[in-house]
Amino acid sequence: MGRLFGTDGVRGVANRELTAELALALGAAAARRLSRSGAPGRRVAVLGRDPRASGEMLEAAVIAGLTSEGVDALRVGVLPTPAVAYLTGAYDADFGVMISASHNPMPDNGIKIFGPGGHKLDDDTEDQIEDLVLGVSRGPGLRPAGAGIGRVIDAEDATERYLRHVAKAATARLDDLAVVVDCAHGAASSAAPRAYRAAGARVIAINAEPNGRNINDGCGSTHLDPLRAAVLAHRADLGLAHDGDADRCLAVDANGDLVDGDAIMVVLALAMKEAGELACNTLVATVMSNLGLHLAMRSAGVTVRTTAVGDRYVLEELRAGDYSLGGEQSGHIVMPALGSTGDGIVTGLRLMTRMVQTGSSLSDLASAMRTLPQVLINVEVVDKATAAAAPSVRTAVEQAAAELGDTGRILLRPSGTEPMIRVMVEAADEGVAQRLAATVADAVSTAR
């Protein structure tokens, strides 16, 4: 990867690492690299954001960068990341920009860029944009003047267009379902409850009052306790949790038990296989997916293709193999027939549709997968590469792997967006998984 882009765009503490100057430069560089030169009509970029306070500042800076290069900024306001991806294609825009740090804390922010059709950029394109930002490449020509300067346009119909799009995910009415949705005070605070109500569900929305400061604060897909409590209090059939930009969806059943991205993928894969919609009888998952997913799919006659962690790699494999379902344990679920990236609202609608069509509870559906005990420890480090390559860490990993044998696995993965290394251990016995994960995590934290 390059110097600015991580696994999910450019991120950092807003106004420190991710400054207005950098946002302007990214907007201008994206305009130079991605806008369709020589095409008839004006060049256009779709621009959206989540509700965190710094989004307004960064939006203004990106707009300045876009318009200074002669690209109109089609502003869609506060909408989920998958909405920006969809609208990039729906408006036939040159590219799209989303300002969000997803599940990260409020002080952080990020900039994600989508190419034509709303597809994530490949590494080469990101490197070319970085070269323009960093001055390695000068880019073409002089900047426009007069009528050639880009304009700012508010897309008044953006939300309605997106809601009409996601409605296609519900192929049955959800009139008998009661669902609690935790919107994380994020980008889906309006769209998610509206989408679920339009499909017929009785919706109890929580954490759906964004004020710019409360996004992901003790709520959403990374903090499920409020959702569990609300599901039990309202005796709902299920609960759905989104993150700050709503490209994720996790669930809890009527008992408050977690149904994570792996279990959701199993439920949807079985539904799609039954309907003849699971292309090549194949599911795409990452190396972080639980062994239980692989066992469940094997027994159902479904092949699992494994990628590196990050929905961009899932997307690449889906496109390369023309597959129809993929995702991550974290709740990024991708169905190319319904979107070019993970969409938490689409996932929620598909999951509830399966419940209605089968007459089964979410608990019963999720029981198709037996989750093996999995322990994940995030270790903060100064230098991810140095810590991961340290001899003491390699020794700890080798010893843990030898003890596990064929009954489990260990994975060491540097985060693509944060200064940490993730240590993951799966084993038939939870105590063994906890012990080995703690041993390896200690080796990582003390590595020199």
From Swiss-Prot:
The protein's matches in InterPro entries, at most eight in alphabetical order, are given as: A-D-PHexomutase_a/b/a-I (IPR005844), A-D-PHexomutase_a/b/a-I/II/III (IPR016055), A-D-PHexomutase_a/b/a-II (IPR005845), A-D-PHexomutase_a/b/a-III (IPR005846), A-D-PHexomutase_C (IPR005843), A-D-PHexomutase_C_sf (IPR036900), A-D-PHexomutase_CS (IPR016066), Alpha-D-phosphohexomutase_SF (IPR005841)
* Binding residues annotated for Mg(2+), in chain numbering: S102, D243, D245, D247
Where in the sequence is Phosphoserine found? Answer: S102
* Cofactor remark: Binds 1 Mg(2+) ion per subunit.
Q: Which cofactor does this sequence's record say it needs?
A: Mg(2+)
GO BP term, pick one: peptidoglycan biosynthetic process
Q: What is its EC number?
A: 5.4.2.10
As for PTM, the annotation reads: Activated by phosphorylation.
Q: List the disulfide bonds.
A: none
Question: Which sites are catalytic?
Answer: S102 (phosphoserine intermediate)
Task: Provide the catalytic activity annotation.
Answer: alpha-D-glucosamine 1-phosphate = D-glucosamine 6-phosphate
Can you provide one Gene Ontology molecular function annotated for this UniProt record?
phosphoglucosamine mutase activity
SUPFAM superfamilies, sorted: Phosphoglucomutase, C-terminal domain (SSF55957), Phosphoglucomutase, first 3 domains (SSF53738)
| GO CC term, one of those recorded | cytosol
The domain of life is Bacteria
The EC class name is isomerase
- Keywords in UniProt for this one? Isomerase, Magnesium, Metal-binding, Phosphoprotein
Q: Note the HAMAP family from the entry.
A: GlmM_B
Q: Which PANTHER family match?
A: PHOSPHOGLUCOMUTASE (ALPHA-D-GLUCOSE-1,6-BISPHOSPHATE-DEPENDENT), PHOSPHOHEXOSE MUTASE
What else is on record for this protein?
Was identified as a high-confidence drug target.
Query: In which family does this protein belong, per the annotation?
Result: Belongs to the phosphohexose mutase family.
Protein task = Catalyzes the conversion of glucosamine-6-phosphate to glucosamine-1-phosphate.
Q: What is this protein called?
A: Phosphoglucosamine mutase
Organism placement in taxonomy: Bacteria, Bacillati, Actinomycetota, Actinomycetes, Mycobacteriales
